[in-house]
Swiss-Prot record:
Its EC number(s): 6.1.1.19
InterPro entries associated with the record: aa-tRNA-synth_I_CS (IPR001412), Arg-tRNA-ligase (IPR001278), Arg-tRNA-synth_N (IPR005148), Arg-tRNA-synth_N_sf (IPR036695), ArgRS_core (IPR035684), DALR_anticod-bd (IPR008909), Rossmann-like_a/b/a_fold (IPR014729), tRNAsynth_Ia_anticodon-bd (IPR009080)
Cross-referenced HAMAP family: Arg_tRNA_synth
GO molecular function: arginine-tRNA ligase activity; ATP binding
Protein name: Arginine--tRNA ligase
Motif extent ('HIGH' region): 121-131
Statement: the UniProt record of this protein carries the keyword Acetylation: no
Native species: Alteromonas mediterranea (strain DSM 17117 / CIP 110805 / LMG 28347 / Deep ecotype)
Quaternary state and interactors: Monomer.
Keyword field: Aminoacyl-tRNA synthetase, ATP-binding, Cytoplasm, Ligase, Nucleotide-binding, Protein biosynthesis
Source superkingdom: Bacteria
Compartments where found: Cytoplasm
One cellular-component annotation, GO: cytoplasm
Length: 576
């Protein structure tokens, strides 16, 4: 059920009946409950066109619009706002329909092919905290899009190519004289550090490293076999992180930089043929007048170095062409940090001019801010090094275990381990997902593991509280009677929120903003707590019909929280 879309349709029909065509139909949620749940704000914009006072137009719309089945009251307020108060019986019926629907009343969207490029770690090193945001925001967006019925193609654009691999392969070749690759590469950070020290300090090693680059790029069989072994072990490290994070990426989603190697020369050739790429100081560049500086100098987009080497720009153009052509993507979403915003803006302009995309295909860079430490600087170890993601997640589980052990619970040792895992990982993910992705945020263990406020533990606890309620009532959620009556204001407020789930999911799918879903789930959990205190269910003297109605509403809360958290990639618990 999408109340917003329903109201837009009804107001559009009313305006057409009044002879007003193609007018904007601004419907928004009301700021305060006394103004109803929704508000139509279009009368003021029509005043000039209709040569009438906004309030008179609003009165006419109220007379014309057909909302008797939905609204208990329509009122004109201020200069011409129309406040919509939703009908309790209609709301109750919508809640009943949602409760008996596996999709909770959320309709599927017209199917699109949507490519989502996310995670994309550099395989020369282990995944670190800088990979957290792209991985979990991307995966949440993917899950929402798939839930809405889209054909989503995950693209893990892993950094598996480049000059640094010459240094790494030369070092690996030496290490394999004494140990197997899995042992040699058990700690990629240490391995990278050792190779870098040798490159900087050991006589002759840098030359060997450069030879390996030439061999690798030339397709030398022995060198490629060594490279494949390195990549295989590195991907296994990434898979360990994906498994801990409960994200849906698999090996079949990998489309690394090397996958585009064969097309890079064609990209340059096509850019030259179309008069876009020109030589400048030996390099091939595209000038972009659309992004000129204040002096009118066009932006310079380098696609091939003077020595003939290719750049990220070349690979990203090849990826654009592959996704738009071979994969036939209606939308391409790319999740990287905000520092790459200009690069992707340039890539889109050049790619569209080159005809690598159709006009109707979208290319959406979804930038995100950085994770900061308590000092307000990028999150690091105490010694200033990068924090391995796997170590951060292990610490989260350990901290969660200690916190839960301190609380009153009847959990067995095995249950405690499982609860600690779900709470710890959920806390890290939710702390990130709940922030607007375009802003930086400060990492804080205490706030993210709190059982109060907008946190994963609070939402997981709210879910277990509903499940506990049903255990105490001796009622099976799957077979319970579904007959909802909304009498108290807390019941009404909770029902309105529950019926806004589809609006929220739609917003996340359009804008790639999981924080909107987090805020919604927190609002639902908070409204449930208020409802739970004001509307008792298991007290003596509560009429069976009232009890059953409130339990049904509680069941819809549980299903909404479970579905919402699942879409965010966060697991729920039966008890904690």
């Amino acid at each position: 059920m999408n109340i917003h879309a329903l109201l837009v349709n009804r107001f559009t029909e009313a305006l057409q009946e009044m002879g007003v065509e193609n007018a904007p139909v601004p419907v928004s949620r009301s700021a305060r409950p006394e103004f109803g749940e929704y508000q139509f704000n279009g009368a003021m914009a029509l005043a000039k066109q209709l040569k009438q006072k906004p309030r008179d137009i609003a009165e006419k719309i109220v007379e014309t619009v057909k909302l008797d089945d939905i609204a208990s009251k329509l009122e004109v307020a201020g200069p011409g706002f129309i406040n919509v108060h939703l009908n309790d019986a209609w709301l109750a019926n919508q809640c009943e329909l949602s409760l008996t629907d596996p999709r909770l009343g959320i309709a599927k969207s017209p199917e699109q092919n949507i490519v989502v490029d996310y995670s994309s770690p550099n395989l020369a090193k282990e995944m670190h905290v800088g990979h957290l945001r792209t991985t979990i925001i991307g995966d949440a967006v993917v899950k929402v899009l798939e839930f809405l019925g889209h054909n989503v193609i995950r693209q893990n654009h892993m950094g598996d190519w480049g000059t640094q691999f010459g240094m790494l392969l030369a070092h690996l070749s030496d290490k394999l004289q004494e140990e197997v690759a899995e042992t040699a590469l058990s700690d990629l950070e240490d391995f990278y550090r050792e190779a870098k020290v040798r490159f900087d300090e050991e006589e002759g090693f840098a030359d060997r490293a450069r030879e390996y680059v030439v061999k690798l790029q030339g397709g030398d069989a022995q060198c490629l076999a060594l490279w494949e072994k390195f990549i295989d072990v590195s991907i296994t490290h990434s898979e360990e992180v994906y498994d801990k994070l409960n994200v849906s990426l698999t090996r079949k989603d990998i489309m690394g930089e090397s996958a585009y190697n064969d097309d890079l020369a064609n990209v340059i050739s096509d850019l030259k043929t179309k008069g876009l790429a020109v030589e400048d100081q030996g390099a091939q560049v595209v000038f972009i007048p659309e992004l000129a500086d204040k002096e009118g100098n066009p932006a310079v987009y380098i696609v091939q170095k003077s020595g003939g080497g290719y750049l990220y720009a070349t690979t990203d153009l090849a990826a654009m062409r592959y996704r738009s052509g071979k994969l036939n993507a209606d939308r391409t979403l790319i999740l990287t940090d905000a520092r790459q915003a200009l690069h992707f803006k340039q890539t889109e302009i050049v790619g569209r001019k080159a005809g690598f995309m159709k006009e109707e295909q979208t290319y959406e860079h979804c930038p995100f801010g950085m994770m900061l430490g308590s000092d307000g600087k990028p999150f690091k170890t105490r010694t200033g090094g990068t924090v391995k993601l796997v170590e951060l997640l292990d610490e989260a589980v350990e901290r969660a275990g200690k916190l839960i052990a301190e609380r009153d619970n009847d959990l067995s040792e095995e249950e405690l381990k499982e609860v600690a895992r779900k709470v710890g990982i959920g806390a890290v993910k939710y702390a990130d997902l709940s922030k607007n992705r375009t802003t930086d945020y400060m990492f804080n263990w205490d706030s993210m593991l709190s059982f109060e406020g907008n946190t994963a533990p609070y939402l997981q606890y709210a879910y277990t509280r509903v499940k506990s309620l049903f255990r105490k009532a001796g009622v099976d959620m799957a077979t319970m009677p579904v007959d909802i009556k909304l009498v108290e204001k807390q019941e009404h407020a909770l029902a309105v929120l529950l019926m806004q789930f589809e609006e929220v999911i739609g917003m996340v799918s359009r804008e790639a903003t999981p924080h909107v879903l987090c805020t919604y789930l927190y609002d639902v959990a908070s409204a449930f707590m208020t409802f739970y205190e004001a509307c008792p269910m298991l007290k003596e003297g509560i009429e069976p019909q009232v009890r059953d109605s409130r339990l049904a509403l509680s069941a819809l809360v549980a299903k909404t929280l479970e579905k919402g958290l699942t879409l965010l990639g966060i697991e729920t618990l039966e008890k904690m």
